[in-house]
Amino acid sequence: MNSGISQVFQRELTCPICLNYFIDPVTIDCGHSFCRPCFYLNWQDIPILTQCFECLKTTQQRNLKTNIRLKKMASRARKASLWLFLSSEEQMCGTHRETKKIFCEVDRSLLCLLCSSSLEHRYHRHCPAEWAAEEHREKLLKKMQSLWEKVCENQRNLNVETTRISHWKDYVNVRLEAIRAEYQKMPAFHHEEEKHNLEMLKKKGKDIFHRLHLSKAKMAHRREILRGTYAELMKMCHKPDVELLQAFGDILHRSESVLLHMPQPLNLELRAGPITGLRDRLNQFRVDITLPHNEANSHIFRRGDLRSICIGCDRQNAPHITATPTSFLAWGAQTFTSGKYYWEVHVGDSWNWAFGVCNKYWKGTNQNGNIHGEEGLFSLGCVKNDIQCSLFTTSPLTLQYVPRPTNHVGLFLDCEARTVSFVDVNQSSPIHTIPNCSFSPPLRPIFCCVHL
């Protein structure tokens, strides 16, 4: 920093972390200011509530806005430093003894006014050096913002894979137990099929576990590359204007290549083999489900012999999709207090649906049309995120890493065992059993379709 600028003025425009003039300064709750890049790099791995670097007061990380006035003052300070530098004897044009205040964008050099009009540079694009430096710095900041969004996206994906790894073995064991439980209800001659299906599921589970670790390693490596590139761009932003102008093009090109080929979370599907005779056994408890006339709508309608319900949003209804998620709920006319019951739902090839049973006190939606909490709701749902569809069950809310069922999905309700089980009818395979359900009879079937 130049001694010609007031020391007090310099101190007020200096980031306490990097000790350079502010670039894109943000002011946090306690009133202290930092460069946004410094704040990001130092607090990314810390929870939302953190401590100020200077006063140690607790502050929020959310909704950081640029301090425009501070940014303008820091820009003026840099311009003053640039002019002092260009006005020095060493920086004068050796040919014309004029100040080199013009920047040539073709050969990235500083020229005096007379040199910029020479035959060599006449047809090149020129601009004032002070203006070019700030414009280039703004381009860097814009690129840094895009890069940081990728840093955060990659970190979210890394967190997803880390969580999956920590829970994967337990999930596989739950799936194995569910299959064993189904075979215990089947005749003894299914023993070889059971053994084969369990061995295949174990092998698939181990393969996926290995792939998860590889995916996590790729994301961790990408995180270091992204953060390193971001720090490099930040360092370039802090360079004196002349150095920034001369080195700008190369670093921008390198940063763009880093944004390519971002690793994504794996699409996990732990497919179990078919269980022979599963549907025949469940059909012993088959019941007819009907909808009260006032609760039927265009998204949930009755099929054929009323032994199954069709659910889903027809793709032809796309013009009716709204920006605000809207849920369409319907309850079955039947109620259950004891016994075992089985029915099927035809979901076709749709997504953003859910169905199951609920306690008598579960209200569905509030006055704003939003779905209430999952307590008292025992359901299977399918949602689409980007290009992937995910299955989940409620009570508790749990992701199910099985292929998305198409056409028919079965529900088996056992009031005495306090369980709700879901079955992929086409694959003759169990999806999940919700154990230890906190039933509060009478129970009612419930169907939901969501337009997103």
From Swiss-Prot:
GO terms for cellular component: cytoplasm. Residues 269-452 form the B30.2/SPRY domain. One of its GO terms (molecular function) is ubiquitin protein ligase activity. A zinc finger (B box-type) spans 88-129. The keyword Ribosomal protein does not apply. The keyword Zinc-finger applies. Pfam families: SPRY, zf-B_box, zf-C3HC4_4. One of its GO terms (biological process) is regulation of gene expression. A zinc finger (RING-type) spans 15-56. Keywords: Metal-binding, Zinc, Zinc-finger. InterPro entries: B30.2/SPRY, B30.2/SPRY_sf, Butyrophylin_SPRY, ConA-like_dom_sf, SPRY_dom, TRIM/RBCC, Znf_B-box, Znf_RING. Zn(2+) binds at residues 93, 96, 115, 121. Belongs to the TRIM/RBCC family. This is Tripartite motif-containing protein 49D. The lineage of its organism: Eukaryota, Metazoa, Chordata, Craniata, Vertebrata.
